[in-house]
């Protein structure tokens, strides 16, 4: 599915990623974790094309995408969920879901995507994307957009950021449902134990290098290191 070969990245004379070699398998829930400043979010942005590596190659389904811009990577089937979702002024929730799907969709279809993330469609479908929506609501709307897009690979950059406990519990439910019903691949950047606990594979990043690979059955050892 996704392969990174010898990826390195530096900024302001500081080495952030150093010779990263990584394979992400299809139809798996993979989590990249590690201490703050280890390069996790930078790695996610490099995969999406928001940052350009200083060296190395990125392959998606066998195709070299190292030099492809964000929009072309999105067209190939890579989706990205930000730590803080963007508020699109003047658009409704339905507008965003329709834009994400790439097609004109019926109201009941859009409502189904909202239901998938635990939102009451009648209350949200025509709402404006504005400051009245909480961080947790925006996060789930963004996930509904990604479900509508049906990305082959969806990247979540610290999905727990900026949301309350109730919203986080709902987020875990959404991830568990996506994992059990979707044939697509999920890559999450997170240090939250409950997200690590549902991962098929856990990759530990420290000081810009991969130091270990494991799974949730070895979670206690991971968290103690």
Could you tell me what each predicted segment is?
Residues 33-35:
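The feature captures the beta-strand-to-loop junction immediately N-terminal to the Walker
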Residues 2, 16-19:
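Conserved structural motif at the start of ABC-family nucleotide-binding domains
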Residues 64-79:
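ABC ATPase NBD coupling module
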Residues 48:
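Helix-to-loop junction immediately C-terminal to a conserved catalytic motif
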Residues 56-63, 76, 109:
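Conserved ABC transporter NBD signature motif
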Residues 158-159:
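Walker B catalytic motif
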Residues 84, 90-106:
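Q-loop/switch helix immediately C-terminal to the Walker
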